[in-house]
Structures are given as C-alpha cells and as structure tokens.
Regions:
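Eukaryotic N-terminal targeting leaders
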Residues: 1-6
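Acetyl-CoA-dependent GNAT
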Residues: 9-106, 110-112, 123-125, 129, ...
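Short hydrophobic/aromatic beta-strand or adjacent loop that forms the aromatic wall/cage
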Residues: 64, 175-179
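Active-site beta-loop-alpha junctions enriched in small/polar residues
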Residues: 107, 143-145
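Conserved G/P- and acidic residue-centered "switch" motifs that form tight phosphate/ATP-binding loops
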Residues: 117-119
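Conserved GNAT acetyl-CoA-binding A-motif
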Residues: 123, 130-143
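Conserved catalytic-core motifs of GNAT/GCN5-like acyltransferases
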Residues: 137-143, 153, 158-176
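Helix-turn-helix
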Residues: 148
Length: 186
C-alpha cells in the first residue's frame, strides 16, 4: 500500500496561503458527512476562514500545533492548495496543573483520500510531537457512531464514555458524543 502522504507541521511563513483549503476540507466534512465540526448549515465561508485564521494565530504563539497531510512536498516546503489532503491539531492550553495534557482537535481528511492511512499518519505524528512537548495525556471527543470513533479505538484510545445529545448535527437533531483519552509513554 502506498504511503498516505507526507505529514508536515504547519509553518505560518510557508503555509498561511492554505487557509481557504483548510476551510474547504472542514466544510466538506460538514456538508458531505454531516460531521459535528463547530458549524451548522448553511455554512458561511467567511466564518470558516475566520475560525481557521484564529487557529493559525494560536500556532504562532505555541498554544496549538497543526499538522498537515499533503500528497507531495517540494524541496522548498511550499505546498500547493490541492496537495492538502488532511489536518489535525493539538491544543495545548496553559495550565500549571495540567501542563502534561493536550487536546486532539479537528482530525479532518478530504473525502477522496479516506481509508488510505492518512488519519493514522497524522495521529502518529501528532503523538510524537505531543511526547516531544511533554504532553503525555491526550484527550478528544468525536461524534458517536462515526468513522472517527472507530479510528480512535483502533489507534489505542480508551473510551471514557458517551454524552447523550452532545452536539447539534448539520443534518438536524442532537447527536451523542464519545470521549477518549490516551496516555503516551515518554
């Protein structure tokens, strides 16, 4: 099986031009899969762009790590928008009592590139980076019953439980949320 792509850390000086492509993958996951992912239909392109710009700003101050999955990478490190096929983020809020915790957010894979190991590649890179930063307890949530729930189980995340009616679905109605954690060894 060929490699799912190349995982690269987001660098604001090299990758800020990808903001519309990040927003497009996010929008596709909401409209195509009805994923609970921050926004409801009808989507506002401006809201999505603004949301991603805020996340990008957090990468610049060290509170957030963003990893990109790309189909190819040229030697300069510059990525063309269509080469972007996935993203995942690690949020690392300041906490003296929880400096070892990190929160996995927005594991999003373009619909045409799923089932090829991209989620595994992104999560493996995220876990390595989390370890390097001393974040040994990872927490996340996802919509119950979706593909991501099965992916996180396969990747060794332990289910904490389900919360009924946790989020509003873009398809309408409330959906349950499943919470996971994983302890990383240093």
């Amino acid at each position: 099986m060929p490699a799912p792509g190349v995982v690269v850390p987001f660098d604001i000086s090299l990758h800020s031009h990808l903001t519309p492509y990040l927003a497009a993958i996010h929008a596709s996951c909401i409209t195509h899969d009805h994923t609970i992912a921050t926004f409801l239909l009808p989507l506002s392109h401006e809201k999505l762009l603004s949301w991603w710009k805020e996340r990008i700003a957090e990468t610049n101050d060290g509170r957030r790590l963003m990893l990109l999955l790309v189909s190819e990478l040229d030697p300069s490190g510059r990525i063309k928008g269509p080469e972007l096929i996935g993203v995942v983020m690690l949020w690392m809020p300041y906490s003296e009592t929880g400096s070892f915790r990190g929160y996995v957010e927005k594991l999003l894979i373009h619909k045409h590139h799923r089932g090829k190991g991209g989620a595994r590649a992104l999560m493996s890179a995220l876990e390595a980076e989390a370890r390097n930063r001393g974040r040994t307890l990872l927490l996340l949530d996802t919509e119950s019953g979706n593909q991501a729930e099965a992916v996180f189980s396969r990747l060794g995340y332990t289910e904490l439980g389900k919360v009924p009616g946790y989020g509003m679905s873009p398809a309408g109605g409330l959906k349950d949320g499943t919470f996971f954690y994983k302890t990383l060894e240093l």
